[in-house]
Swiss-Prot record:
It holds the Pfam family Ribosomal_L5. InterPro entries: Ribosomal_uL5, Ribosomal_uL5_bac-type, Ribosomal_uL5_C, Ribosomal_uL5_dom_sf, Ribosomal_uL5_N. This is one of the proteins that bind and probably mediate the attachment of the 5S RNA into the large ribosomal subunit, where it forms part of the central protuberance. In the 70S ribosome it contacts protein S13 of the 30S subunit (bridge B1b), connecting the 2 subunits; this bridge is implicated in subunit movement. Contacts the P site tRNA; the 5S rRNA and some of its associated proteins might help stabilize positioning of ribosome-bound tRNAs. This is Large ribosomal subunit protein uL5. GO terms for cellular component: ribonucleoprotein complex; ribosome. It comes from Parafrankia sp. (strain EAN1pec). NCBIfam families: PRK00010.1.
Length: 189
């Protein structure tokens, strides 16, 4: 009995990063060491559902949507403190979060850049100013229907989400150059 191990296909964006983007970044910033080249560590997709404090069923829709978009089961985030003004008790579910790494991360970024972002109405590009000073980029998406995995007829309510791309870049310029090379459509400011 022989066992054949079929190699899994390498995600398209990951292959492009290895073959084209990393060498171009090394040349642009003249790095002496290969490990200095900025790369993507993880992508965190967070969906805050503040209304879940009043209706706990709303969190189910958010987790279903996030699971469909990312291909991974989301972690339900719970309130750390009770806040009387918001009618919030400690331990109540108020959001859902997914952390993507490895091949799932590369495939999600590829779908985000090539399919989802162009589907946003009146989209003029992402703001190039939303970097955190350490090369990481966070932006918000107003509705989940831009992802083709979501069936528009089955949406119970429009939910937005925050997407954070964590990189190994040491400053914003390196992070911006990396994400621009990966295909992120930054608007000219």
């Amino acid at each position: 009995m022989s066992v054949t191990t079929e190699a899994r296909p390498v995600p398209r964006l990951k292959q492009r990063y290895r073959e084209e983007i990393a060498p171009a970044l090394r040349e642009e910033f003249s790095y002496g060491n290969v490990m200095q080249i900025p790369g993507v560590v993880k992508v965190v997709v967070n969906m805050g559902v503040g209304d879940a404090a009043r209706d706990a069923k709303l969190i189910d829709g958010a987790t279903r949507d996030l699971a469909a978009i990312t291909g991974q089961k989301p972690a339900v985030r719970r309130a750390k403190k009770s806040i009387a003004q918001f009618k919030l008790r400690e331990g109540q579910p108020i959001g859902a979060k997914v952390t993507l790494r490895g091949d799932r991360m590369w495939e999600f970024l590829d779908r985000l850049v090539t399919i989802a972002l162009p589907r946003i109405r009146d989209f003029r590009g992402l703001s190039p100013k939303q970097f955190d000073g350490a090369g990481n980029y966070t932006f918000g998406v107003i509705e989940q229907s831009i992802f083709h995995e979501i069936d528009i007829d089955r949406i119970d309510r429009v939910r937005g989400m925050d997407i954070t791309v964590v990189t190994t870049a040491t400053n914003d310029d390196e992070g911006r150059a990396l994400l621009r090379a990966l295909g992120f459509p930054f608007r000219e400011s």
